[in-house]
Amino acid sequence: MLRAVRDVNDAAVPALELVPSQAETRPWGSFWVLDEGPMYKIKRIEVKPGHRLSLQMHYHRSEHWIVVRGTAKVTRGEEVMLLSSNESTYIPPCTKHRLENPGTLPLVLIEVQNGEYLGEDDIVRFEDDYARQ
C-alpha cells in the first residue's frame, strides 16, 4: 500500500508503508534483494533522513548506485558528492565509501553489485555511527 508524503515543494511523493517481509533492517534504514545471480546482486536500499551507513570497503565486489528518490551524499575515496534522483555513481572494489541521507525524506536507491563474492561479510568498516564492527 502506498501513501503520499510531501516534499519541500509541497508535491505529493509516494512512500512505502509496508516493507517486504524479506527486507533486512539496519539502524540506518533497510534493504532487500530484488534479484541475484552468478556474480551480481541487485538491492533496493532505503536510508532514513539524517542517517548514514558506515565508512566501509569491500574486497570482492564493486557497486553501482542509482538514486531513485531523495538526495544522497556519497563519499568515494577522497571525493564527496551529492546525487539526486536519476543520478548515479560507481564504487570500485577496495575503495572506501559511505552513503548518507542529508535530506528530510527517505533516500531510495538501487544498488547493483558485481563480483566473485557478494556475501554481506565482505565488509571492512572504518567508521560506524552505530558502533558495529
Predicted regions and their residues:
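Short acidic-glycine-tyrosine-enriched beta hairpin
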Residues: G77-K96
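Histidine-centered active-site/metal-ligand motif
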Residues: Q56-H58, H97
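A short hydrophobic beta-strand segment most commonly corresponding to one strand
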Residues: M1-L2, H64, T104-R125
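Asparagine-centered strand-capping/turn motif at beta-strand->loop junctions
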Residues: L99-P102
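Charged, often glycine-enriched C-terminal and inter-domain segments
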Residues: S21, I66, I91-P92
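Glycine- and acidic-residue-biased ligand/ion/polar-headgroup-sensing regions
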Residues: Y59-K73, G77-E78
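A short, N-terminal "cap"/entry segment at the start of jelly-roll beta-barrel domains
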Residues: M1-R44, K48-L55, I123-Q133
